[in-house]
């Protein structure tokens, strides 16, 4: 029994090392592991992947309803747009290091997939684990928090199509809710629906114009854009995989500071199937 337990643990470690250096595990890989074997290995944060030879197609018929389920988005590269010191230069995206590496992927996202009247393919997100709080560390030491999400995503192809294949590219926008919720209190106990209206240490300056942004909390909602480029398709199982690129705003500290653009690049996986009548 001890030998079996040791062998199972060894295989889990090996699988974790292999998947850390590859695109991700397959459904068959994870199907052989238990919760204890996956725990603390980072595998739970990885999206499933398909073989490189998966180059099939999934036909779509007009008038029929389809669903995109088990959609997983795993960001692997993070960039933050920084304003240059020289006004003559343009703002550029600077690579950052993610600090929340085990909790950065979206999973079990689902929605409607259909052919629109103009022949283009459209995906409308309905729910799932569709947000993750992430913090990125910049080279200068600044930490940039943001809420990675695809809430309310509506993405479409630019050209008419009759199938999902390796040339399919879905682009669209989504809503980015506030990083903080209404009951959050900042270090000076100020909040949106609870807490003080101003810093306790300076009550006489509570209405000062330069402190308004910090005192008056707001639930700021932003807009993001994403591109889902399909590169692998298994027509037999309905599985699809590919690369995504998303640009969205960072946290504003409930209106206390200006948001900056955050760019995420990673891999995604999903499954297309007929929708229930």
From Swiss-Prot:
It is a peripheral membrane protein. Residues 1-27 form the signal peptide. It is found in: Cellular thylakoid membrane. Gene3D superfamilies: photosynthetic oxygen evolving center domain, Photosystem II, cytochrome c-550 precursor. GO terms for biological process: photosystem II assembly; photosystem II stabilization. One of its GO terms (molecular function) is oxygen evolving activity. Its main location: membrane. SUPFAM superfamilies: OMPA-like. Keywords: Manganese, Membrane, Photosynthesis, Photosystem II, Signal, Thylakoid. GO terms for cellular component: photosystem II oxygen evolving complex; plasma membrane-derived thylakoid membrane. InterPro entries: OMP/PagP_b-brl, PsbO. One of the extrinsic, lumenal subunits of photosystem II (PSII), which stabilize and protect the oxygen-evolving complex. PSII is a light-driven water plastoquinone oxidoreductase, using light energy to abstract electrons from H(2)O, generating a proton gradient subsequently used for ATP formation. Required for dimerization of PSII and for binding of PsbQ to PSII. PSII is composed of 1 copy each of membrane proteins PsbA, PsbB, PsbC, PsbD, PsbE, PsbF, PsbH, PsbI, PsbJ, PsbK, PsbL, PsbM, PsbT, PsbX, PsbY, PsbZ, Psb30/Ycf12, peripheral proteins PsbO, CyanoQ (PsbQ), PsbU, PsbV and a large number of cofactors. It forms dimeric complexes. Belongs to the PsbO family. This is Photosystem II extrinsic protein O. The gene is psbO.
């Amino acid at each position: 029994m001890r030998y079996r337990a040791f062998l199972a643990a060894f295989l889990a470690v090996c699988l974790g090392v292999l998947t850390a250096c590859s695109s991700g595990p397959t459904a068959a890989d994870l199907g052989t592991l238990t919760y204890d074997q996956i725990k603390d290995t980072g595998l739970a944060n990885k999206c499933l992947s398909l073989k490189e030879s998966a180059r099939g197609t999934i036909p779509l018929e007009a008038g029929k309803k389809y669903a995109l389920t088990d959609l997983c988005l795993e960001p692997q590269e993070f960039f933050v747009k920084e304003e240059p010191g020289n006004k003559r230069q343009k703002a550029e995206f600077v690579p950052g290091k993610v600090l929340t590496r085990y909790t950065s992927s979206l999973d079990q996202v689902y929605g409607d997939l259909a052919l629109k009247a103009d022949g283009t393919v459209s995906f409308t997100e309905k729910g799932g684990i569709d947000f993750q709080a992430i913090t990125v560390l910049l080279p200068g030491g600044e930490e940039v928090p943001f809420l990675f999400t695809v809430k309310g995503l509506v993405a479409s192809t630019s050209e008419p199509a009759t199938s999902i294949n390796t040339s399919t590219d879905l682009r669209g926008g989504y809503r980015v809710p506030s990083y903080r919720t209404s009951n959050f209190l900042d270090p000076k106990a100020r909040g949106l629906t609870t807490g003080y209206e101003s810093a306790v240490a300076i009550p006489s300056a509570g209405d000062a114009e330069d402190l308004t942004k910090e005192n008056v909390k707001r639930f700021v909602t932003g807009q993001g854009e994403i591109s889902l480029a399909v590169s692998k398709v298994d027509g037999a199982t309905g599985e699809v995989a590919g690369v995504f690129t998303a640009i969205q705003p960072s946290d504003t500290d409930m209106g206390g500071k200006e948001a900056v653009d955050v760019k995420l690049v990673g891999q995604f996986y999903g499954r297309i199937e007929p929708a229930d009548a």
